[in-house]
Amino acid sequence: MGLEIVIKDIQEGARAEVSRINTEADAKASEITNEAKEVQKKMLGDSLAKVEEDLQKLHQQVISSANLEVKRITLNKRKELLDNVYSQTVESIKSMPASKNEKLLKHIIDKYEASGDKIYSSKASEETVRKLSSLTYAGNIDCIGGVVLENEDGTVRLDYTYDSILKNVYERSLKQISDILYG
């Protein structure tokens, strides 16, 4: 019986040792698993934070790009509308009654004739300009109306064409026109 007791003691000791080793192994495995889960959570959290940051940056870029595109389209439309207004004004000047054209030419000639020796006009206004001015008629120019005055030797030219007057007024008034049209 002595041997059976020794064998039994060894078996119980071995079982106790196996149980202790299993318990330690389970504890160590649980600790490693928990650490791995924590590392995984941290990595996932970091990844999510990076993705959220990247999405926020991308969102901001898309919004900025969209805003720039809207501004570009708006400015192009405003320019197009202002160009249309300019074109309509040119057409209104071209089609104004002869009496009004004569009145405007008379005003320009009376006011500025002393500044020149020769006068130019459009072909359509030639007869009226010859009638209203005492200056030498020097020829026709390509314009919608008005006159150009020139000194004797041609070194000084004063442009009082409707084209240049309209262009100057248009450029000076561009901001004001834009404010009126677009509030």
Swiss-Prot record:
Gene: atpE
Superkingdom: Archaea
Primary role: Component of the A-type ATP synthase that produces ATP from ADP in the presence of a proton gradient across the membrane.
Subcellular location: Cell membrane
Keyword Chloroplast annotated: no
GO biological processes: proton motive force-driven plasma membrane ATP synthesis
Protein name from the UniProt record: A-type ATP synthase subunit E
Pfam families in the record: vATP-synt_E
Topology of this chain in the membrane: Peripheral membrane protein
SUPFAM superfamilies per UniProt: V-type ATPase subunit E-like (SSF160527)
Organism name: Methanosarcina acetivorans (strain ATCC 35395 / DSM 2834 / JCM 12185 / C2A)
Subunit relationships: Has multiple subunits with at least A(3), B(3), C, D, E, F, H, I and proteolipid K(x).
Keyword Cell division: no
Keyword field: ATP synthesis, Cell membrane, Hydrogen ion transport, Ion transport, Membrane, Transport
GO cellular component terms given for this protein: plasma membrane; proton-transporting two-sector ATPase complex, catalytic domain
One annotated GO molecular function: ATP binding
